[in-house]
Amino acid sequence: KDVETTLNNVVGVDFNNKIKVTPNIEVTFLENGHLIGAAMILIEINYPGEEPINVLFTGDYNNKNEFLNLHELPMRVRNKRMSVVIESTYGDTSVEEINHGFFSEKVLEAIEERKTIILPVFSLGRSQEILLRLKELQDTNKLDVNIPIYFDGKLAQAYTALYCNSKILIDESKKDFFPRNLVAVNCEIREKLLQTDDCKIIVTTSGMGTYGPAQVYIPYFISKENALILFTGYTAEGSFGANLRNAEEGEIVKVGGLICKKFADVSYCNEFSAHAKSEELIELLKKFNNLRGILINHGQTKTKDAFAEKILREIDINEVGILNRE
């Protein structure tokens, strides 16, 4: 009931349009590549006789998105006396640390060895990006179109349907992102997939392996040598994906309610990310011509500290605040 009440009060707005919240407060949503529909939020507070207050909240931020053509920040925003609250998820990670090409290399290697490939994905953003990458591998004749690709996860399937809906304005050149030989999985098909060891690709939620159909596939394939489980995104400490990271071959692991021996190849790629890296975050801050203050949030303590030090080295500002620092 609360959700329905909330949704009935939601009003869609365009990017870069000022919204008057009160006579003295205006809000503007600014483009953000984190996910489809993501936005940075600029709050402008103006009272007669007082210095204007402008605060930009980046939220989860990325400077790019496979499915969007992002525009530059408007100059009217860049020239304001601005305080920025910025995320720091990858504030200590350099662009140079990203292993580009690892995903394709691992997938094609596993196909050559006729393995079953499990690709845990997040429902929104990562699912569609992985489907696009698999299509690109097919289009360049690197991935055999006869290899079946199964797509599991109700929420991921629902989000993917939205990408195909003209109401979501994604890049026209990316609208045809389905790989050939793609099958949407239901419960019946899922059971059949567990009964065969033939070469196939299974794209499944959840991204960290903790929820969704991944909790069905991983326990089954973790003990098989002819399987690759390739995590395509961030695995938070304590998540199932993170717990598998340090398990050696043949080591006993707990998977849901099962205790299994790990013989599958479990790998992790970092080339897909919905968060900007440290240099890209700095690049965003450098766009502002009159920075008043910077506050860092959303990151591990050591990451926030490292990013704060980088800001002080590279941005003309004397101090940086860290929110929720332990």
Whereabouts are the PLM-identified features?
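Active-site neighborhood of phospho(di)ester-bond hydrolases with catalytic His/Asp-centered motifs
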Residues: F29-G33, L56-Y61, V85-T89, L119-F122, ...
